Amino acid sequence: MCIRDRGGNDCSFKHKMARLILKVQVSNTDGFDDTAVLEFADYKLGGLVHEGTFDVKTGTAATAGSVVSDWMLRQCTGAPKTATDKCVATFDAATGVMTFTMILLPQTLANALVLEISPDDGEYQSYSNKDMIKPALEAGYSYTYTITVKKTGLTLSGSTIENWNDGGSHSGDAKM
């Protein structure tokens, strides 16, 4: 524990998990007239390990479980539809972009992640990517993928890998 009081040391922290951001959009020129079909779509992501350990002495986070093939990021049910989210999910109505942000255990993927999307367009079709998302999820790094849903499938239009931004240095006192 690090407490600044009576000449103590400042605390320093590092990200020990990885962040994965998926930005999903539709292509108006490739079959979708309404960008809102993503707001109440179902999203399933497969290929990640969700269980693990964290060693407080070494600061190491590691996976210790099996790959999950059917993690529902967002599931929409009912009339009117309501969404149940398993991660941070936001829909930007102005742009039609659905963004999922996940904090995950660092891991090297044996296979590419499989993202399956069932848009709310009344056609009851699912779209999935084919070996497009395969990051080595490294501690302290953020990975962003932009995925475009087309009537013919999904297209990965770009990815970025970056360090997390510095939130600045802050200090304070804790007194008993």
In which residue ranges do the predicted regions lie?
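Extracytoplasmic cysteine-anchoring/structural motifs
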Residues: 4-176
